[in-house]
Design a protein with these regions (language model features):
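Conserved NTP-donor binding/palm subdomain of two-metal-ion nucleotidyltransferases/polymerases, i.e.
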Residues: 1-36, 42-237, 241-242
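Short phosphate-binding/catalytic loops that engage adenosine nucleotides
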Residues: 19, 260-261
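Short acidic, S/G/P-rich loop/turn micro-motifs used as interaction or catalytic elements
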Residues: 41, 100-102, 243-247, 292-295, ...
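Glycine-rich phosphate-binding P-loop
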Residues: 237-256
């Protein structure tokens, strides 16, 4: 399976189950080039169906190996698939309903889905997909970049290109955030990437400080954070001896890079190892330990492979992740699927 095949298998799930959805972000080169997460907006009924039906993709060669909640209504998945060369490929759908940042609601999903547009790919056997209207894409993408306080040249170019598709509609959408409107329009019209990048921190403060967090949202976000602690999505592998760790490190990290948010190498003698391992696992980090740890740190080890073959170790890690994800989230255990 290629990443293109994996993408259209995922899109087929939405189409087959009649989930209303729209992709967010620069999809100009989809499905041939997908170099980041696949960001998706849906409504609450659609999200419930997605959580239930995504497990059926295993019959098509896509395995759920990760799932975690990173906002009140946002869930990050990792789907693993075997590529034609025998290696592992990954597709990372990041799906949400209303757009929240730090438990503050910024955008409603339903109006955006009402205005979505069809993007056809006539040269692709998979067909097309749904994407946001240019005005919604402009505002959503801008708010994401402001929230992360990060904007690359390619991302700024995407904002400008989307703005040019419907300038009036983009201005109207941006008017919902008066503290952003004039400044952002000026940066875009003047092609001032440096100015917008420098203003991101200030713009973020103006967006978030002008809105309060309702108590129910604060409670839901606290529950989410507690869940991340008690259901960590990181993984710790012990290499059998220092030489194995040095040999495995680049190859194993390359094989598993798409399955985790971060990667790290630790030595078993590292000061404060237990605390560091726990923090790494909560942050969805793949950790390779050069030696077997002692004390409480041993409790955080997920795999101590007996073999030396990197591909076998990578497959064992993905098998363990798949089992863990099913145990935590798959509704088949409750007779739903």
């Amino acid at each position: 399976m290629t990443k293109k095949d994996a993408f259209f298998t995922l899109i087929g799930l939405f189409e087959r189950t009649n989930i209303r959805y729209a992709l967010v972000g620069n999809t100009d080169e989809y499905p041939d080039h997908i170099d980041s997460d696949v960001d998706i907006v849906t409504d609450e009924p659609g999200l419930a169906i997605f959580h239930r039906e995504i497990w059926s993709l295993e019959r098509s060669g896509l395995r759920v190996v990760q799932r975690f909640q990173h906002e009140i209504t946002a869930f990050y998945y990792v789907l693993a698939f075997q590529m034609p060369d025998g290696g592992w490929g990954y597709l990372q759908p990041d799906i949400c309903t209303d757009y929240y940042r730090k438990a503050i609601k910024l955008l409603d999903a339903v109006p955006m889905l009402d205005r979505r547009r069809r993007v056809d790919r006539p040269d692709s056997s998979g067909g097309g997909f749904w994407a946001l209207h240019p005005a919604d894409e402009f505002l959503y993408y801008l708010l994401k970049k402001i929230g992360k306080k990060s904007l690359s040249s390619a991302q700024f170019r995407h904002l400008c290109d989307v703005f040019l598709l419907d300038p009036d509609a983009c201005r109207e959408a941006l008017s919902r955030f008066p503290t952003l409107s004039d400044r952002v329009i000026s940066f875009v019209q003047e092609n001032d990437e440096t100015g917008l990048s420098a203003a991101l921190a200030n713009l973020k403060q103006s967006v978030l400080t002008s809105r309060s967090i309702p108590k129910p949202c604060r409670f839901r976000d606290s529950i989410r954070k507690i869940g991340r602690v008690f259901r960590p999505t990181g993984f710790v592998v012990v290499a059998l001896g220092k030489s194995s760790g040095q040999e495995w490190s680049p190859l194993l990290h390359a094989a598993l890079s798409g399955a985790f948010r971060r990667q790290a190498d630790f030595h078993a003698a590292k000061a404060g190892l237990f605390r560091k391992l726990l923090a790494a696992k909560i942050a969805s980090t793949f950790v390779l330990l050069e030696d077997n740890p002692s004390g409480l740190s041993r409790l955080l080890v997920d795999l101590m492979p007996s073999g030396q073959d990197v591909s076998e170790v990578a497959s064992a890690v993905l098998d363990a992740l798949s089992i863990r994800a099913k145990r935590r989230h798959c509704p088949v255990r409750k007779g739903v699927v």
